[in-house]
């Protein structure tokens, strides 16, 4: 198991290229199950979860090969079982459920794992698929689903679930008749999945709105598709510029998809602008100011940026309040930031952050993916040395983050614990 050792206090200056989106790539790769012809994906990040997904696809009968940032998938002899040994490490593995039911009429998927940041129940997925004709039972830790042929249905989500929207979107492409997803997730990654499915021959309208209509088709063909840039990785690097007092140019950076984050960072005293070369981020003269953040489904402030922005709040003048509305138990990074000198108090789903003059390096432990990123950011700004342990969480969502940061002036080394 590795850790990161960070020598803080260095302003970051230079250019960083934003990788492809993990949260877009995972469902799109799972959608390979739906196609009957070879597929080629470009701009794919080399992450643990992506490698796990490729292994899972190969076991399911869709051999997947990585070369550079390209993944090639050859759907052939499909099998219905997603085994526990792979599924236990990754929550997104449940996304193979809808495609398997659509193609084979059966699926045997182990209950998934991933970050421990709340319940994230799969019940919404199962209830919706049942409306399309699927039947489920739980047996020895496996979700076993069966259907003759999925039928189009009108499905209303009580909450705009991203994973549920993606699973049903994929399943509905091969269902008989029309499926309507109401109160659907509007996240850019859902839109990217829909665009990919359309490139394969699916008939989808309304993606990016709260009502998506899918007209089932008999089959999907292959295509070549470029994965969208990772808005959360990009947002993390924007915060890195602000927290270190540096100046970074992000190439391949999404803009509209980051609007809610950019508005808050600018309100805190950063200057972020779109240029012909990319997105430029730096701290304005006058220092950082506190602000309030409430996490919401897209187009609101993303829960996946909450921990990173909280690190910035720790060094901002005044008081900031974070209200977490998406996941319970997503303040596990707070105690570690407090170890570094932060002044944070938690009350239910709210955290009150009072800015301090400096953070001090300390040994800290990552609890989930985005908490890991917040601790790295805090370490970049801290006086002294920070040891971030259990960075296997970090490797699930960031493509060798220490190499990208070191290229713009950071002093980070990876060591075995």
Curated annotation (Swiss-Prot):
Q: Give Gene Ontology CC terms.
A: cytoplasm
Entry keyword Transcription: no
Principal cellular location given in the protein's record: cytoplasm
Give EC number(s), comma-separated.
Answer: 2.5.1.7
- Kindly list the biological process annotations in GO that this record carries: cell division; cell wall organization; peptidoglycan biosynthetic process; regulation of cell shape; UDP-N-acetylgalactosamine biosynthetic process
Binding-site residues for UDP-N-acetyl-alpha-D-glucosamine, renumbered to this chain: 91, 120-124, 304, 326
Family annotation (CDD domains): UdpNAET
| Catalytic residue positions | 115 (proton donor)
* EC class name: transferase
Task: Provide the function of this protein.
Answer: Cell wall formation. Adds enolpyruvyl to UDP-N-acetylglucosamine.
* Family, per entry: Belongs to the EPSP synthase family. MurA subfamily.
Q: What is this protein's record name?
A: UDP-N-acetylglucosamine 1-carboxyvinyltransferase
Q: Which organism is it from?
A: Nitratidesulfovibrio vulgaris (strain DP4)
């Amino acid at each position: 198991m590795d850790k990161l050792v960070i020598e803080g206090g260095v302003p970051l200056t230079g250019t960083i290229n934003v990788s492809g989106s993990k949260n877009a790539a995972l469902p799109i790769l799972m959608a390979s199950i739906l196609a009957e012809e070879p597929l080629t994906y470009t701009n794919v990040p080399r992450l643990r979860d992506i490698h796990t997904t490729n292994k899972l696809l190969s076991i399911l009968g869709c051999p997947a090969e990585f070369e550079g940032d390209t993944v090639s998938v050859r759907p052939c002899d499909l099998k219905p079982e997603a085994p526990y040994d792979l599924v236990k490490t990754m929550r997104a593995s449940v996304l193979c459920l809808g495609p398997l039911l659509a193609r084979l009429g059966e699926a045997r998927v182990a209950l998934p794992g991933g970050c421990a940041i709340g319940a994230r129940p799969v019940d919404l997925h199962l209830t919706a698929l049942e409306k399309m004709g699927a039947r489920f039972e739980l047996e020895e830790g496996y979700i076993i689903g069966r259907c003759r042929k999925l039928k189009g249905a009108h499905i209303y989500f009580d909450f705009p679930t991203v994973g549920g929207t993606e699973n049903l979107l994929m399943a509905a492409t091969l269902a008989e008749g029309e499926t309507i997803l109401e109160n659907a997730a509007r996240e850019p990654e859902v839109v990217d999945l829909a665009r990919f499915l359309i490139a394969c021959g699916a008939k989808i309208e309304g993606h990016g709105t709260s009502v998506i209509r899918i007209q089932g088709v008999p089959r999907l063909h292959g295509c070549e598709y470029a994965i969208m840039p990772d808005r959360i990785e990009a947002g993390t690097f924007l915060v890195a510029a602000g927290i270190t007092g540096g100046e970074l140019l992000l190439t391949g950076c999404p803009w509209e998809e980051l609007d809610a984050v950019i508005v808050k960072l600018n309100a805190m005293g950063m200057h972020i602008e779109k240029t012909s070369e990319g997105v430029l981020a730096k701290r304005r003269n006058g220092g950082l100011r506190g602000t309030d953040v409430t996490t919401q489904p897209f187009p609101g402030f993303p829960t996946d940026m909450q921990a990173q922005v909280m690190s910035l709040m720790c060094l901002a003048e005044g008081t900031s309040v974070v209200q977490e509305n998406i996941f319970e138990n997503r303040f596990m990074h707070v105690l570690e930031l407090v170890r570094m000198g932060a002044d944070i108090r938690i009350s239910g789903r709210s955290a009150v952050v009072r800015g301090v003059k400096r953070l001090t390096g300390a040994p800290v432990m990552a609890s989930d993916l985005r908490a890991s990123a917040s601790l790295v950011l805090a370490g970049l700004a801290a006086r002294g040395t920070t040891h971030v342990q259990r960075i296997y969480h970090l490797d699930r969502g960031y493509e060798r983050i220490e190499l990208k940061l070191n290229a713009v002036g950071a002093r980070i080394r990876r060591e075995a614990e």
